[in-house]
Amino acid sequence: MVLPASMRLRGHRCFSRLHRSQRRHHGKWMVLRQIKRDRTLLRSELRSQHDTTCRCALVISNKVSKRAVRRNRLRRLLHNHLRQRLEQRTDLAGTWLLFSLRPDAAEAEPAQLLEECDSLLKIAGLER
């Protein structure tokens, strides 16, 4: 399943700010970047909405896999996992997260990716 619209992070300004973020947590297959929200970076129609949970984005480049089918499968797997973990967490409202998969992530087993995702959330202080 895809992340609900209330949890999605969109817009090049948001991604640029997250890429410059100092709060990075590195794993073997992915990198987690984290910042507090900055409403000025959002599109005008989203600025007035109140965040009920954190906003997330997932970046999977062509370096991970040349095949779109494989990249989409990884995206769906991680979106579903993040949705289950973070959708009900109202204490994380105002936090923006960016998960970037590394090129060798395509060789990892799905269980390993989900475990690393959880460990990065725990390191970042976002997991209970």
Swiss-Prot record:
Keywords, in A-Z order: Endonuclease, Hydrolase, Nuclease, RNA-binding, tRNA processing
GO biological process: tRNA 5'-leader removal
Catalytic activity: Endonucleolytic cleavage of RNA, removing 5'-extranucleotides from tRNA precursor
One term of GO molecular function: 3'-tRNA processing endoribonuclease activity
GO cellular component, one term: ribonuclease P complex
EC identifiers of the protein: 3.1.26.5
Highest taxon in the source lineage: Bacteria
Keyword Cell cycle: no
Claim: rRNA processing is one of the keywords in the record: no
Family annotation (HAMAP family): RNase_P
Family: Belongs to the RnpA family.
Quaternary structure and partners: Consists of a catalytic RNA component (M1 or rnpB) and a protein subunit.
Protein purpose: RNaseP catalyzes the removal of the 5'-leader sequence from pre-tRNA to produce the mature 5'-terminus. It can also cleave other RNA substrates such as 4.5S RNA. The protein component plays an auxiliary but essential role in vivo by binding to the 5'-leader sequence and broadening the substrate specificity of the ribozyme.
Protein name: Ribonuclease P protein component
Gene name linked to the record: rnpA
